[in-house]
Structure formats: structure tokens, C-alpha cells
Amino acid sequence: MNATSSVGASGLMQVMPNTAKYVAKKIGMTSYTQEKLKDTNTNLTLGSNYLNMVLVDLDGSWVLASAAYNAGPSRSKLWRERLNAPVEGAIFAETIPFHETRTYVKNVLSNASYYSGVMTGQTISLKQRLGTIAPKAAIQSELP
């Protein structure tokens, strides 16, 4: 898939070239080249591995991880650090200062709830999926 965003993200998972290079190295994909980012299987592998990396780095929070996937992990961490008290994930999502990221998070997580129900027959409410976001000092990680 040859889809490229205005900021340079490529493929089905819209992975940035530097992020793809980082993830490929981390998962041992020794044959990676930037041209392979256009290959759907490679793109899915890199994008899903990166999403898992940010999910782990952000304590399993789907709200923070989806925001990080779109705007970068350092921004998600900064937004969480600025909280004064724990808030519902929906409230946190509504306070994301970037319109694109705020919309992305809402779309991704509402679709995840819907398709999870379709695929498994078990629904997880959007509120449950969003959880609660508690303040936490931002700790720098190596994730791009």
C-alpha cells in the first residue's frame, strides 16, 4: 500500500520512517529498508509492534497509547503528567490539545470497542476500554 500522509507516515498503519527503522531494529528485522514500509505485511508488523511498545510503555492505557501512536509518546506522557487528579479516560481524551489526535483517539477506541464485539461476541463498553487516567511524572523512554 502506497499511502503516504502529509507528514511522511506510510502504509496501512501510517508508520513514520524513523519509527519503522527503530521498531525493525528492536524486533530483529534485519532485512528492513524504507522501501519495505510500503509492503502491507511489513507495515502491519512494524505498526502493530510499535503500538504494543507504546501500550506497554504507557502502562496498558489504550487512551494514552492511541494518543502516543498519533502524536508521539512524549506528548501523551506530558498530557498525563499535567493532570491534577485521576480522570475518566473520556474526559482525558476530550482535553487532548490537538484536534487531530483527539479525534483519532475517539475514533480508534470507539471502533475498537465495536469490532471487538463483532469479532468475539463479547462487548467491552467504551467507558471500560477508556479506563481512568491518573497523573504520573513523565519518564523519558527511547521510543520515537
Language-model-detected regions and their locations in the chain:
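Catalytic glycan-binding domains that act on GlcNAc-containing polysaccharides
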Residues: 1-144
